[in-house]
Amino acid sequence: TLVNNEVSKPLFDMAKGETPFEINSRIGYSGDSSSDISLKPLNYEQKDEKVAFSGGEFQLNADRDGKAISLSGEAQSGRIDAVNEYNQKVQLTFNNLKTDGSSTLASFGERVGNQKLSLEKMTISVEGKELALLEGMEISGKSDLVNDGKTINSQLDYSLNSLKVQNQDLGSGKLTLKVGQIDGEAWHQFSQQYNAQTQALLAQPEIANNPELYQEKVTEAFFSALPLMLKGDPVITIAPLSWKNSQGESALNLSLFLKDPATTKEAPQ
């Protein structure tokens, strides 16, 4: 149970003085652990900002070394009220959020595994009028090790059963994105460089307190580290990206074969 102190007081305020979450853990003789995490209902209001959360129940399992981890659980609902940069009141709500996933730590220091996230409904409203309604959203991701555990093949599946914008039914969509032949060591180097650069940005108040400048610098950090990912000549495949509505259905299939600039002998175009 979380202790109420100066650091955690804002969380207790949101939970009306109650502990915002409780964790009950069990550790076996092998050192493996299982934890039941109970997130308590939250209600927070300050001026034009409001946050309401139904609470949720999650279970976290880990082996003794923390190399194998799984997390599953669900939250019934949540709502956020805020004011955007145009001084408009914006409200976001969600219903029935569920997650289920597991991962293991690979030899090169990055995690691989499976993750699934689903959301029954999400609404976005501006000035009391519904702008968008998304129903039946599901994201599934997986990554597998090949070539003696040195290479990653990954896949992301996204589906949306219904999208309505200003009460107009725009249809449903699906996306399957595959990225193969990712060099594990290169991915680790990319991750370390990118994370180090973004953490350095947060230590600079003139950047961290300017959202537009911060996003610009984060993008620069991403693209400066991106060439590291080209080791192994990864392949990106989109098959399909499809959208279906009352007018019909359209689909796109695309494959990109990337080359490591350090190994290519062709002159840049």
Language model segments and positions:
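Glycine-rich, small/hydroxylated-residue low-complexity segments
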Residues: 1-269
